Each structure stands twice: as C-alpha cells, then as structure tokens.
Amino acid sequence: MADEALFQFLHSEIIQYVNSAETGESENGRCVSKLENMGFRVGQGLIERFTKDTPRFKDELDVMKFICKDFWTSVFKKQIDNLRTNHQGIYVLQDNKFRLLTQLSAGKQYLEHAPKFLAFTCGLVRGALSNIGVKSIVTAEVSVMPACKFQVMIQKM
C-alpha cells in the first residue's frame, strides 16, 4: 500500500516538475513528449527485469496478454479490465479505474489535464514493447474519469 502511494506521489511530482519547466501552449506538447520519453526508458528497464526468467513469447497476442496481466499488475497493482483486438495489429487496453487518474476530480474541466497524467504510462507500455522487440505507437484517451483506454498500434517491420 505504501509503495503505491509513493509511486502516485512521485508521478504527480514528475508531472509538476516537467510542467513547470515548460510554460505556454506550445510547450504543453513538449511536456507530454518528455513524460512519454521518461516512461519509455522506465518501461524498457522494467520489462527487462520482468521477462528475465520468462519463456519466449509465441506471438503479439501473447506479448499483449503479458503486458495486461503481469506487467500492469506489477506497476499498477491490478490487471487491465479489458483487452480488445482487431487481429490486425491494433489492441485496446481499458482500465476502468486507472490509478494515476483517481486523484483528479471527475469534472470535465480536468479532462484537458489528463494527457499529462497518461503520457508516462503510454511511454511505459511503448518502452516495454520495444524491449521485447515489438515496435508500436501507444496513445491514450479519457472519456469519463478515471476510466481510460490505451490504444496500441503494432508497426510491422
């Protein structure tokens, strides 16, 4: 329980630090980009440790199941609520109570701040997939707080 609170506090402080370094409208995109790059590096390191003793994955779906179950549980203390795919390289991971958004108020005015709180996690997933050998683009969307959807588009090489 304590480590969860520490992670949430550290995450919000990182957002505040990066946001204070970048001010203005055009810098908002730069802030999101920096947060995603931080998450990318952390995701690479975490997945390396988590898959150290894991047998090789059979296919993309196997990798995504690992991300949704084991990886997500290690980072956020719960599994993804829903995983959907079109079997053509697009996966949608849905978390109905995303821990990093639960601290924000559910009002519509806070939806504009949500991308900053999701950028690190997008980078985390992209970095994890990259280190496994899966090139991807990860985006996130929030329609109702604190639920969010992460869309993972696998890029074929």
Swiss-Prot record:
GO terms for biological process: endoplasmic reticulum to Golgi vesicle-mediated transport; nervous system development. SUPFAM superfamilies: Ligand-binding domain in the NO signalling and Golgi transport. Signal peptide: none annotated. Disruption phenotype: Morpholino knockdown of the protein causes neurodevelopmental abnormalities associated with decreased survival rate. Morphants are characterized by microcephaly, brain hyperexcitability and lower seizure threshold. GO terms for cellular component: cis-Golgi network; endoplasmic reticulum; trans-Golgi network; TRAPP complex. Keywords: Endoplasmic reticulum, Golgi apparatus, Neurogenesis. It is found in: Golgi apparatus, cis-Golgi network; Endoplasmic reticulum. Disulfide bonds: none annotated. InterPro entries: NO_sig/Golgi_transp_ligand-bd, TRAPP_component, TRAPPC6/Trs33. It comes from the Eukaryota. Homodimer. Part of a TRAPP complex. Component of a transport protein particle (TRAPP) complex that may function in specific stages of inter-organelle traffic. Specifically involved in the early development of neural circuitry, likely by controlling the frequency and amplitude of intracellular calcium transients implicated in the regulation of neuron differentiation and survival. Belongs to the TRAPP small subunits family. BET3 subfamily. This is Trafficking protein particle complex subunit 6b. It comes from Danio rerio. The gene is trappc6b.
